[in-house]
């Protein structure tokens, strides 16, 4: 892992949810989705000691029992004291461990059923949803005249740049996981949740760290810059996980600028998540509001992906159809059953591009 560092939190964009007053979702994302890093090694404060029994006050001298009885009482008293001390230490350590575990959601292998749900969404569901969602969904920014992306000498390609703590990345990963499963097979997908202290607290999602997509059509690379593990004593900071390669960094730096993203920060920097589909379609910030995933387990979300009337599914698959249309444009319409589907064709029409 790379060293930790500290940066301000800003940037990002996402649609304003229906009926939500006050600060818009777009502004909220801009204020919270810029990469956050940490200074120094992660660590927690030392645990406080437990309470040990306090001996009672001495009273007037009592008649002394026989020596053998005194020895037995002393022995049993010592055993009891040891048992109490062990119990206290156990409770203190258990409490300390629970407190530490509550500060973030660990990354663990994705359950097989969740991965299967993501990979086996019926085509009829994709088509029924198309680009129709009860929740607002932002379209990717479409570029023209740019060369196809090359990563590790392979083209076409798609690049994702985000962080495990980021709630906007949490929402976007559901759409990416479903869309990319139409073009290949996932391996080593993990589950986790966004920050427990950021907005849209503990949004359940995937982690793409260490995950791979085996696809004959597209090269996919993911960079999870930071974990969701807080750095002690540095609010809003998380431990570093992964750095972009020089090739990936050049793509991120170029296409996250205001030249290609009208809403990019004038002060520079990249908004999480940043998604570049073959230098054709750019996503900066969440496509839909992660708030709609509040209270949903991984299984709740994945098991609903086959239901085109589910509002959460509609937001995820609308975003996924937009991504699929951009990928299909890059793969020259392959695979045919995906790229000629009515859902992808509707997305391509909405984006003003061809899906073949």
Role assignments for model-derived ranges:
Residues 157-163:
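Short glycine-rich or small-residue beta-strand-to-loop segments that form or flank ligand, phosphate
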Residues 2-157, 171-173, 181-356:
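Non-globular targeting/processing and membrane-anchoring segments
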Residues 163-174:
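Conserved redox-active cysteine motifs that mediate thiol-disulfide chemistry
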């Amino acid at each position: 892992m790379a060293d930790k560092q500290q940066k301000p939190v800003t940037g990002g964009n996402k649609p304003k949810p229906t009926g939500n007053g006050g600060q818009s979702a777009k502004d909220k994302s801009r204020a919270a989705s810029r990469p956050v890093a940490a200074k120094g090694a992660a660590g927690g404060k030392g645990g406080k000691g437990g309470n040990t029994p306090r001996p009672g006050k001495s009273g007037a001298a009592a008649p002394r029992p026989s020596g053998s009885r005194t020895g037995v009482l002393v022995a049993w008293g010592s055993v009891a004291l040891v048992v109490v001390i062990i119990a206290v230490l156990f409770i203190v350590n258990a409490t300390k461990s629970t407190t530490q575990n509550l500060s973030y959601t660990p990354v663990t292998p994705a359950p097989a059923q969740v991965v299967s749900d993501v990979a086996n969404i019926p085509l009829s569901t994709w088509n029924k949803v198309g680009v129709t969602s009860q929740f607002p969904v932002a379209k990717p920014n479409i570029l023209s005249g740019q060369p196809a992306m090359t990563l590790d000498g392979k083209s076409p390609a798609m690049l994702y740049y985000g962080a495990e703590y980021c709630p906007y990345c949490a929402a976007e990963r559901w759409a990416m996981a479903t869309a990319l499963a139409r073009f290949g097979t996932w391996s080593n997908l993990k589950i986790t949740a966004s920050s427990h202290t950021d907005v849209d607290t503990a949004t359940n999602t995937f982690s793409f760290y260490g995950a791979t997509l085996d696809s004959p059509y597209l090269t996919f690379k993911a960079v999870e810059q930071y974990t969701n593990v807080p750095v002690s004593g540095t609010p809003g900071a998380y431990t570093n996980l992964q750095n972009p390669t020089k090739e990936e960094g050049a793509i991120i730096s170029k296409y996250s600028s205001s030249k290609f993203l009208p809403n990019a920060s004038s002060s520079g920097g990249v908004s999480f998540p940043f998604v570049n589909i073959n230098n054709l379609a750019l996503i900066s910030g969440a496509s839909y509001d992660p708030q709609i995933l509040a209270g949903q387990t991984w299984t709740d979300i994945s098991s609903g992906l086959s239901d085109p009337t589910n509002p959460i599914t509609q937001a995820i698959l609308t975003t996924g159809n937009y991504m699929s249309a951009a990928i299909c444009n890059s793969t020259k319409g392959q695979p045919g059953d995906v790229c000629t589907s009515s859902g992808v064709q509707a997305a391509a029409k909405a984006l003003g591009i061809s899906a073949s």
